[in-house]
From Swiss-Prot:
Keywords (A to Z) from UniProt: Cell cycle, Cell division, Chromosome partition, Cytoplasm
Species this protein is from: Streptococcus sanguinis (strain SK36)
Protein name stated in the entry: Segregation and condensation protein A
Function summary: Participates in chromosomal partition during cell division. May act via the formation of a condensin-like complex containing Smc and ScpB that pull DNA away from mid-cell into both cell halves.
Subunit structure: Component of a cohesin-like complex composed of ScpA, ScpB and the Smc homodimer, in which ScpA and ScpB bind to the head domain of Smc. The presence of the three proteins is required for the association of the complex with DNA.
Keyword 4Fe-4S in record: no
Protein origin, superkingdom: Bacteria
GO annotation, biological process: cell division; chromosome segregation; DNA replication
GN (gene name): scpA
Primary localization: cytoplasm
Record's subcellular location: Cytoplasm
Length: 236
């Protein structure tokens, strides 16, 4: 399965999505939390051996610099540089937001004008059918990053060293179906309760994403940053 960041037009688009979840002015967001979520998302993709393009890694480096400076003792010069870096980042996100809104407005105007022409509007079909059609799927990845961290700690304390490679997504899809069956909803972390190694954890998550993609499983998050639940088809 090929999972990429193509639903986001770049790292600023990803950051804008994270910032917008706070529902406050961009300059009022807790920037450290946003940075941690961005880094957790990218780290999760890397742990799953998925493609992360260079521009996302460049932004990750910049965010790590801002985060590291915020952890340093407050010195006048350092504090000023830290504020400059943070304000520059927020300004970039705000500028990107304005351009994106303008682009969406122009797109709507184009669609309105198309109604006045007899010639049928050309429909563009993109061949890249990506998994992340809904950007809220990023919340799944953010929740999964916590699962990975917990499981890595759990496995590191275990004396079991056998790692299997033969897990199949199709088999794990059936596991998720069975665990969702008969329940009104299932907390995401419950799916991974009995996993034995990291390969199983990752394959199980990919299976969950595939079930979401084919609409066999619905994702529910009742509030921003809240727990994520899975609802099987027929249990809505």
């Amino acid at each position: 399965m090929d999972i990429k960041l193509k639903d986001f037009e770049g790292p600023l688009d990803l950051l804008l999505h994270l910032v917008s979840k706070y529902q406050v002015d961009i300059y009022d967001v807790p920037i450290t939390e946003v940075i941690e979520q961005y880094l957790a998302y990218v780290a999760t993709l890397q742990a799953m051996k998925l493609e992360v393009t260079g521009e996302y890694m460049v932004m990750a480096s910049q965010l790590m610099l801002i985060k590291s400076r915020k952890l340093l003792p407050k010195v006048a010069d350092n504090a000023e540089l830290e504020d400059d870096l943070e304000q520059d980042l927020l300004s970039q996100i705000e500028e990107y937001r304005r351009f994106k809104l303008l682009g969406e407005k122009m797109s709507l105007q184009h669609d309105d004008r198309a109604l006045y022409y007899s010639k049928p509007k050309l429909e563009l079909v993109y061949e890249d059918a990506e998994l992340l059609h809904d950007k809220s799927t990023i919340d799944l990845f953010l929740a999964f990053s916590k699962v990975i961290a917990k499981k890595q700690e759990e496995f590191s304390k275990s004396h079991t060293t056998i790692v299997r490679d033969e897990y199949k997504i199709e088999d794990m899809m059936e596991v998720v179906r069975q665990r969702c069956a008969g329940k009104s909803r299932l907390a995401l972390q419950e799916i991974f309760a009995e996993t034995k190694d990291m390969n199983e954890v990752i394959t199980l998550f990919l299976a969950t994403l595939e079930l979401v993609k084919v609409q066999e499983v619905q994702v529910i998050q009742e509030e921003n940053f809240g727990n994520i639940y899975l609802v099987g088809r027929g249990n809505e």
